[in-house]
Amino acid sequence: MKLLVLAVLLTVAAADSGISPRAVWQFRKMIKCVIPGSDPFLEYNNYGCYCGLGGSGTPVDELDKCCQTHDNCYDQAKKLDSCKFLLDNPYTHTYSYSCSGSAITCSSKNKECEAFICNCDRNAAICFSKAPYNKAHKNLDTKKYCQS
């Protein structure tokens, strides 16, 4: 039941932030590709200053820096003419990628915006796989530790 509530909350949060729930699930699957035993939404949501919705201040560690870089990548995507959030973009249509072993490959058939977002997610997932996870940074008091 708790997982169902979490899934609903994440879907609402994703929709509110302009990212379709499908895009969030794709990013989750990418993380599971490179970290097979992980539970991305439970482990990485509300981690540090940047993992989850929003972000501010200085990242608390390498993993949090991965999330900050991912946020910045999405900000860059929004500046692309092909990502002007009309009808054909990865926020409303999913991108194509494959996972073989722990290798993620974004499809060459993706359009420019889809390819950009796919690579944002791919690079973040790989970054997550290389960064240590510090349980003390989960559900961090962002008002105390993440002010600019």
From Swiss-Prot:
Q: Where in the chain are disulfide-linked cysteines found?
A: C33-C99, C49-C146, C51-C67, C66-C127, C73-C120, C83-C113, C106-C118
Active site, UniProt feature: H70, D121
GO terms under biological process = actin filament organization; antibacterial humoral response; antimicrobial humoral immune response mediated by antimicrobial peptide; arachidonate secretion; cellular response to insulin stimulus; defense response to Gram-positive bacterium; fatty acid biosynthetic process; innate immune response in mucosa
- Gene Ontology MF, one: phospholipid binding
Please tell me in which tissues this protein is expressed: Selectively expressed in pancreas, lung, liver and kidney. Also detected at lower levels in ovary and testis.
**Name of this protein:** Phospholipase A2
Instruction: List cellular component terms (GO).
Output: cell surface; extracellular region; extracellular space
Record key words, sorted: Autocatalytic cleavage, Calcium, Disulfide bond, Hydrolase, Lipid metabolism, Metal-binding, Phospholipid metabolism, Secreted, Signal, Zymogen
